[in-house]
Amino acid sequence: MIQTSSIDWLRVGGITAGHKINSLAEKYGVPVIPHAGQMHNYHLTMASNNCPFSEFFPVHQVEIGNELFYYLFKGAPEPENGFIDLNDNTPGLGISINEKYKSDFKILE
């Protein structure tokens, strides 16, 4: 019996697929805890009663690799007293491209 599920929304098909998986899990009483602490995960967590919490990874100096979100985007919330608050006044996911590091990456169109 599955007691909880940790899903990487980017690997299962994105936000729409994440909502579908979460709905199915909720139907069977299986809470979903999104893997990785990025804005899309925070939005999915806060949009569902079936996600009790989300992972959070503090930003620290690391080699560039899976930590692209640390460098490529700005605007992610910082937790206060163990909680994250999403700003309702910012468009989309609430993040923007960080121009400071943009030239460090090759952008393919």
Q: Language-model segments: which ranges?
A:
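C-terminal extensions of enzymes
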Residues: 64-109
